[in-house]
């Protein structure tokens, strides 16, 4: 195991319903990268964009070498192949970690999955298959999965593919909500990278996102 090395996998929704939030998403993602670059320790960045198709944007780029996201990279279209994006990312990282020498395997693997809508376009992966894949990596290797969903019961949806309630949160899909999202995600990823064990980070990580959502909905 290579100490202080993190594999950070971001799975970003760019389906048509994200229209109008392109700049907010780009700005939030770039701010997160900047924050991570300031932190000690190594990290490889994998970024997967999805609509009705899945696109690999960054393929384990060293963190310091990742250029800012631009409008040429992130533009919206199509439907929501959420399961295919998650399945592709997990399958890819499993293959990488299994085939690397033990001394080169990342100490931590963190997935951040962000979507504003429910699955409606996947062809390769089912909920059950994703659940088995995620549960295996969590239980055997301590991988972390954060799920941030808008326009849905995010906790209920995350449970369908094996992500526990303390790692799932519903956010408000507008400029303010997206900004809060990325601020919290950046802070949480930093804490996970620094912590001796990611599991030591409890459900408190998502309190700011929950408070923002509840404030706007008076609940």
Give a label for each model feature:
Residues 1-219:
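Acidic, low-complexity intrinsically disordered regions
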């Amino acid at each position: 195991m290579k100490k202080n090395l993190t594999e950070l996998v971001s799975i970003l929704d760019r389906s048509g319903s994200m229209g109008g939030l392109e700049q907010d998403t780009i700005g939030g993602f770039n701010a997160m990268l900047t924050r991570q670059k300031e932190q000690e320790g190594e990290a490889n960045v994998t970024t997967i964009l999805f609509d009705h198709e899945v696109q690999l944007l960054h393929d384990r780029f060293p963190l310091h070498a990742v250029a800012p996201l631009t409008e040429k990279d992130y533009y919206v279209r199509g439907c929501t192949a959420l399961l295919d994006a998650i399945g592709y990312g997990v399958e890819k990282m499993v293959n990488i970690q299994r085939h690397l020498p033990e001394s080169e395997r990342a100490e931590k693997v963190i997935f951040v999955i962000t979507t504003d809508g429910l699955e409606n376009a996947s062809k390769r992966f089912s909920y059950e298959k994703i659940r088995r894949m995620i549960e295996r990596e969590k239980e055997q290797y301590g991988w972390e999965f954060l799920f941030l969903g808008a326009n849905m019961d995010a906790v209920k949806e995350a449970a369908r593919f094996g992500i526990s309630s303390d790692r799932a949160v519903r956010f408000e899909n507008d400029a303010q909500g997206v900004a809060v999202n990325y601020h919290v995600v950046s802070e949480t990823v930093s804490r996970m990278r620094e912590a001796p064990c990611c599991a030591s980070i409890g459900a408190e990580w998502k309190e700011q996102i929950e408070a923002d959502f509840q404030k706007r909905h008076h609940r």
